[in-house]
Amino acid sequence: MDVLHDDTPDLRSLPQERLASLIAGLGEKPFRARQVYRWLHLRGAASLEEMTDVPRALRERLAEGTRLTTLERATEQRSADGTIKWTWRTRDGKLVESVYLPETDRKTLCVSTQVGCAVGCTFCMTGTMGLARNLEPGEIVDQVHRANRRLIELGEGEGPRPLTNLVFMGMGEPLANYRSLKVALDLLLSEDGPNFSHRHVTVSTSGLVPVMRRLGEETQVKLAVSLNATTDAQRDAIMPINRRYPLAELLRACREFPMKQGRRITFEYVMLGGVNDAPEDAERLARLLRGIPAKVNLIPYNENPGLGFAAPAPGAVERFRDLLVARNVTAVVRKNRGTDIAAACGQLAAEGGPGDPRRRAAAALTGTPAAG
């Protein structure tokens, strides 16, 4: 489901070596390609006109034969806790969201990789959208560039790169758009570009097992797995991808995931009241993760109207964490951020709304009647 049927090269989407080849083909010296690349990916230029030290003749030739992806900021919402959610409009009018999460020691951007999502997790608002299309590499990296520039305007940091960390946990399943993701990662990690550290970039997956090993072999970024259940029956009901790649297969892929010594896989566990938050779930989770260098992020469910799930009862998350810690599993409770602007985990949905199949699934799990 790739985007626009347009063969015009997008400068923002080109790997560094392909950009160099394109500019060499115009008869230019190699240093010109580096100049253009740094304007695109270090300074986040929104147009060719901004590239003031690039000869006008070259800019005009590039304008004739290429295009330059630049997202338009459609909305900006600021939370009381400092979180900012941006909705970006693409060239074909699609909307995607990214979220800025400021902390004392880091400034993180949660990045989207698709318009919508085909995975269909029943507790997630993005899943109600379905999948419209994949994002191009330039549309992925430009979320970072637009965010960096906006943060400088807001006085949230100094240029050219206030952001310190990236998490690919926004709209979409990153590994389902691996071609674009890999190019985007290379651009974002490049020394002539933003030069993010591998240690500060995390890619999340719902469990697309065949692509997980490829990610580990071809990059050194960190892996997060959206687990959310401790039995196949439970996970089948809330995450349909489990019917293709059940828990045993997923966890085997985690054990085999290529990692540098000292690294850990983060397991995201969204806690749904009355569904997956019982003491027995904590005990099963500890057993499942045995032998895997793991850290568990416990995420109290952010309630979404119409989806039918509820947050855990008071104290349930802390008790769950304590049970894991007692079984030698590193576990932390992730603080919900941006809930007042629908920017928290599972709340991103730039288009669409709740669907009946998700309400029915929630009702089946919780024993409550489905609305509608």
Swiss-Prot record:
Cofactor mode of binding and number, as noted: Binds 1 [4Fe-4S] cluster. The cluster is coordinated with 3 cysteines and an exchangeable S-adenosyl-L-methionine.
Pfam name, any one: RlmN_N
Xref: InterPro entries: Aldolase_TIM, Methyltransferase_A, RlmN_N, RNA_MTrfase_RlmN, rRNA_lsu_MTrfase_RlmN/Cfr, rSAM
GO molecular function (one): rRNA binding
Obligatory cofactor(s): [4Fe-4S] cluster
Record-listed S-adenosyl-L-methionine binding positions: G172, E173, S204, S226, L227, N228, N302
GO CC list: cytoplasm
Residues binding [4Fe-4S] cluster: C117, C121, C124
Catalytic reaction annotation: adenosine(2503) in 23S rRNA + 2 reduced [2Fe-2S]-[ferredoxin] + 2 S-adenosyl-L-methionine = 2-methyladenosine(2503) in 23S rRNA + 5'-deoxyadenosine + L-methionine + 2 oxidized [2Fe-2S]-[ferredoxin] + S-adenosyl-L-homocysteine; adenosine(37) in tRNA + 2 reduced [2Fe-2S]-[ferredoxin] + 2 S-adenosyl-L-methionine = 2-methyladenosine(37) in tRNA + 5'-deoxyadenosine + L-methionine + 2 oxidized [2Fe-2S]-[ferredoxin] + S-adenosyl-L-homocysteine
Biological process terms in GO annotation: rRNA base methylation; tRNA methylation
Keywords: 4Fe-4S, Cytoplasm, Disulfide bond, Iron, Iron-sulfur, Metal-binding, Methyltransferase, rRNA processing, S-adenosyl-L-methionine, Transferase, tRNA processing
Disulfide bonds: C110-C345
Entry EC number(s): 2.1.1.192
Subcellular location: Cytoplasm
Biased composition (Low complexity): 362-372
Catalytic residue positions: E97, C345
UniProt domain Radical SAM core: residue ranges: 103-340
Note: Reaction proceeds by a ping-pong mechanism involving intermediate methylation of a conserved cysteine residue.
Cited function: Specifically methylates position 2 of adenine 2503 in 23S rRNA and position 2 of adenine 37 in tRNAs. m2A2503 modification seems to play a crucial role in the proofreading step occurring at the peptidyl transferase center and thus would serve to optimize ribosomal fidelity.
Listed PANTHER family: 23S RRNA METHYLTRANSFERASE, RADICAL SAM CORE DOMAIN-CONTAINING PROTEIN
Family: Belongs to the radical SAM superfamily. RlmN family.
Protein name: Dual-specificity RNA methyltransferase RlmN
Gene source species: Anaeromyxobacter dehalogenans (strain 2CP-C)
